[in-house]
Curated annotation (Swiss-Prot):
This is Phosphoenolpyruvate transferase. It holds the Pfam family CofD. 7,8-didemethyl-8-hydroxy-5-deazariboflavin binds at residue 58. CDD domains: CofD_like. Keywords: Magnesium, Transferase. Its EC number is 2.7.8.28. Homodimer. GO terms for molecular function: LPPG:FO 2-phospho-L-lactate transferase activity; magnesium ion binding. The keyword Magnesium applies.
Length: 322
């Protein structure tokens, strides 16, 4: 099987690890080996201290490569923060985004390669040569695209980078809208459209539907390519609340209810063929979409592999019907 997964950060990375485990088990049972291509969100990317940081790409790379801080779900294991402490001592800003010493090395390599003229897709491939994540990891685009948030507070109406809204303010400042700066003129990275075209099916992990998967689908050409395939998604909402993070604040901003049904309808039956929901949402009905219920908390590797395996099973079933 050739599988394409659209992924954000923590939720996407953990789902991918479960997917790898599920496919490995199938191979042990005699099934043909499968390949996974991950199209990663780069809308969260930000330049800090002259370094280009790609949080979601790095989270996927570190998680699948065995270098992630498991407790946090982001950043490097065994991290230190000497450089950050020195920057704070110099009064450098921003101080709300903590770059660890090991993590900074990744950003230095990326930034030097960007300055030398290499595209982000080639840089990501080079970084993965070290981590060997066991998937083909592609950025959604080689062009610079950033998600900004229009907010209104005591400082007035202004646009701030998504990372500032998310990390510094914990999404507590009411947002008026999200703006994907640069997306309109961006092109899918090399290999993205061909990977989708050649895939047996596409999976949406329980990543943020607005600023992660939504950002990927917002690159011209990607949504249409995905819509032509069998697509199965895993709900990031359980019992009316996000599985993790603050996706409810993002959904509220675009006028979408925080529910498994509403997120599926936001994606649309023209895009989504199957939808996995938690048992708490077993009564979910989405017109034109096959809905299945199972425990969706990715509480341990076995449960995560079971969720990913169920998504694969549903995708194969729906593909067979089409």
């Amino acid at each position: 099987m050739r599988i394409v997964v659209l992924a954000g950060g923590i939720g996407g990375a953990r789902f991918l690890r479960g997917l790898k485990d599920a496919l490995h088990h199938r191979a042990e049972q005699g099934e043909s080996p499968s390949s996974i291509t991950v199209i990663g969100n780069t809308g969260d990317d930000i330049t800090l201290f002259g370094l280009r940081v790609c949080p979601d790409l790095d989270t996927v790379m570190y998680t699948l490569g065995g270098g992630i801080n498991e407790e946090q779900g982001w950043g490097r294991a065994d991290e230190t923060f000497t450089v950050r402490e020195e920057l704070i001592a110099y009064g450098m800003h921003p101080q709300w985004f903590g770059l660890g010493d090991r993590d900074i090395a990744t950003h230095i390599v990326r930034s030097q390669m960007l300055a030398a003229g290499y595209p982000l897709s080639a840089i990501t491939e080079a970084l993965c040569d070290r981590w060997k994540p066991g998937v083909r990891l592609l950025p959604m685009t080689d062009d610079q695209v950033e998600t900004h948030v229009v907010v209104a507070d005591e400082k007035g109406r202004r646009a701030i980078h998504f990372q500032e809204w998310w990390v510094r303010y914990r999404a507590q400042i009411p947002a008026e809208s999200f703006v994907s700066v640069g997306a309109d003129s961006a092109k899918p990275a090399p290999g993205v459209l061909s990977a989708i075209d050649e895939a047996d099916f596409v999976l949406f992990p329980p990543s943020n539907p607005v600023v992660s998967i939504g950002s990927i689908l917002g690159i011209p050409g990607i949504r249409d390519a995905v819509a032509a395939k069998t697509v199965v998604g895993v709900s990031p909402i359980i019992g009316g609340a996000p599985v993790r993070g603050m996706a409810d604040a993002c959904l509220r901003t675009i006028g979408v209810e925080t529910s498994a049904r509403a997120v599926a309808e936001h994606y649309g039956a023209d895009l989504l063929d199957g939808w996995l929901v938690d048992e708490a949402d077993a009564d979910t009905v989405v017109a034109g979409v096959e809905v299945r219920a199972m425990p969706l908390y990715m509480s341990d590797p076995e449960r995560t592999a079971a969720i990913a395996g169920a998504a694969v099973d549903l995708a194969l079933e729906l593909k067979e019907r089409s």
